[in-house]
Amino acid sequence: MKLKTLSVGEVNNYVKKLVENDFILKNLNVKGEISNLKFHSSGHIYFSLKDENSKVNCIMFKNNAVNLDFRLEEGMKVEIKARLGVYHKEGTYQLYCENIKKAGIGELFEEFHKLKKELSEEGIFDEKYKRALPKFPKRIGIITARTGAAVRDIINVIQRRNKSLDIILYPAKVQGENAADSIIEGIRYFNNEKSVDVIILGRGGGSIEELWAFNNRDLAYEIFNSRIPTVSAVGHEVDFTISDFVSDMRAPTPSAAGELVSPSLQEMINDLLNKKEFLHRAVDRRFLNAKRDVDLLHKGLKGNNPTHIIEKRIKEVNTLEEKLNFLGKRKIDKAKDELIALNSILQTLNPLNTLGRGYSVIMDKEDKVINKVSELKKNDMVKVIMKDGSVNIDIKIINE
């Protein structure tokens, strides 16, 4: 007998009828822990119910939700009365809840608060251990997944604020089995290599189980013992993990972490100019003080005529002059060396020097810098500035 070929819709309808006609699946009592909780504006409640090994999607419609005598919370352990249904369009199944009873606080939340209390009593969260982030870092280490919104957000913010900063990514697992060990390896790598000035631990938002790697005791100790300052940027602003409490600073989002660790180029230039001005004033002050001392000695000599006093004072003046010349020369040499170093830094930060490393700048006919392809249209005339000059180019083809 040849079997009939079914459409996808026919398969889903068949499964739907099987499920809806099953007596057990129409009268289920299921216990588990709430995660991914969402209260819809329609009044419906969406969430997942999970245990150690599995999870299932659930929905409670408004007509049943209004009868709840408590508010559902993330991590809450509950027992639900429900029926299993199939969503025909997607071919997925979910539990349709008629009633929910509270069964206690979720085990993960209990474990989180227990660990937080223990580590707090050990003192590793104390403010006295928090280190200030470097004001002007040169290299920034990021420990997060190789792909995803978190790493994109951090890198985009840092490069927007200061393109001269080096960024080193340590790709790590940030969710699931062995994720905490992977993050620990990243911290050890940066500490052993001594290759960065500050470390960002980053991950996008998620449920408590998705962020659980950052609630690991061994990871907390590794962050505490890190010789390099750390910034925890895990989840959204409302999410808190153990790594937030033990790190030197917590950022509410990965993007905010990028802002915290990257001084703008203008801030760096202003700081260098202020130091240069301070050195000038210090040298001038030293010379003025020395000159005043010499003038006072000369006045004292004029008021004492005896030859031996004059000779004595002349010797003192000569000694002071020699000392002044020595100190002045040493101060000038030191100031000169510092100014040369500052000038070298300024030259490094000079955007025009970037052209010498193979980059170029594209400008429109009004000499405005073009950053995006979307700012151009066909037949536009642009000027491309390179190391040794510039060329004018007509735009013929745009690839986006």
Curated annotation (Swiss-Prot):
GO terms under cellular component: cytoplasm; exodeoxyribonuclease VII complex
GO MF, any single term: exodeoxyribonuclease VII activity
Keyword annotations: Cytoplasm, Exonuclease, Hydrolase, Nuclease
EC number(s) on file: 3.1.11.6
Main location as per UniProt: cytoplasm
Reaction equations catalysed: Exonucleolytic cleavage in either 5'- to 3'- or 3'- to 5'-direction to yield nucleoside 5'-phosphates
Uppermost EC category: hydrolase
Presence of the UniProt keyword Hydrolase in the record: yes
Pfam families the record matches: Exonuc_VII_L, tRNA_anti_2
Transmembrane regions: none
Gene Ontology terms describing biological process: DNA catabolic process
InterPro entries documented for this protein: Exonuc_VII_L (IPR003753), Exonuc_VII_lsu_C (IPR020579), OB-fold_nuc-bd_dom (IPR025824)
Localization, UniProt: Cytoplasm
NCBIfam families associated with the record: xseA
HAMAP family: Exonuc_7_L
Task performed by this protein: Bidirectionally degrades single-stranded DNA into large acid-insoluble oligonucleotides, which are then degraded further into small acid-soluble oligonucleotides.
Family in the record: Belongs to the XseA family.
Subunit structure: Heterooligomer composed of large and small subunits.
Protein name, UniProt field: Exodeoxyribonuclease 7 large subunit
Organism from which the protein derives: Clostridium perfringens (strain 13 / Type A)
